[in-house]
Structures are given as C-alpha cells and as structure tokens.
C-alpha cells in the first residue's frame, strides 16, 4: 500500500524523469491505489480501440498513460519546482510551498 499522495487534481506539475522529462502540464486524474497520476497532454500512448456502436469510430487512438507520482514535481507559481509541506491554520490543513511558504 502506498502512502498519502501530496499531488492533487488540477495541480501544475513538471515531469522530472522519463521520456517526457522537463515538460509541464496539469494533473487530470490521480490514481491513489497505484501511486500514479495522469497529466493532460503528456505521456501519450497509442491504443487500439474496438468500435462500440454504429456511430463510434474504432481504430488506433492516442490516450494519456499514467505516470508514477515519484516522477512528477509540483510547481509553485512564485518559485517553480518545489516540495509540499502542510500547515494548520485555524483548524484547517493547507498545502504550502517549502521554498517560499505560499499556499498551493
């Protein structure tokens, strides 16, 4: 079982390892049980899809493949790539940037 993931949907991230290294995108989906994320427009794979109905087109389509959460890093608007810390204010837990302290 994987630990708690600090990456959430709609986070801006940069890929730090693999064939898409250095590219930035937004997290579309988080796969908590597999410790993976799907980043919009990155890590595209070709998949053969079967025709489902008369109107639906079958054939080869490109879809986004999951990336290991350890291969992406959250981007802070102020200082760029950063790690995430948690801060409790007024009983609410918020994610903050470790470099500049801004809320993410």
Swiss-Prot record:
One GO CC annotation: ribonucleoprotein complex
Entry-linked Pfam families: KOW, ribosomal_L24
Record-linked InterPro entries: KOW, Rib_uL2_dom2, Ribosomal_uL24, Ribosomal_uL24_CS, Ribosomal_uL24_KOW, Translation_prot_SH3-like_sf
Keywords, alphabetical: Ribonucleoprotein, Ribosomal protein, RNA-binding, rRNA-binding
rRNA-binding as UniProt keyword: yes
Gene Ontology biological-process entries: translation
Record flagged with keyword Mitochondrion: no
Family matches, as HAMAP family: Ribosomal_uL24_B
Complex and partners: Part of the 50S ribosomal subunit.
Stated name of the protein: Large ribosomal subunit protein uL24
Species name: Treponema denticola (strain ATCC 35405 / DSM 14222 / CIP 103919 / JCM 8153 / KCTC 15104)
């Amino acid at each position: 079982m994987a630990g708690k993931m600090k990456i959430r949907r709609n986070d801006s991230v940069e890929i730090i390892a693999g064939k898409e290294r250095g590219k930035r995108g937004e997290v579309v989906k988080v796969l908590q049980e597999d410790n993976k994320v799907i980043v919009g427009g990155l890590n595209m794979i070709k998949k053969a899809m079967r025709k489902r109905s008369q109107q639906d087109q079958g054939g080869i389509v490109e879809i986004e493949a999951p990336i290991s959460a350890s291969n992406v890093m959250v981007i802070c608007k102020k200082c760029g790539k950063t790690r995430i810390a948690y801060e409790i204010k007024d009983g609410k837990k918020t994610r903050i940037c470790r470099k500049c302290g801004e809320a993410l």
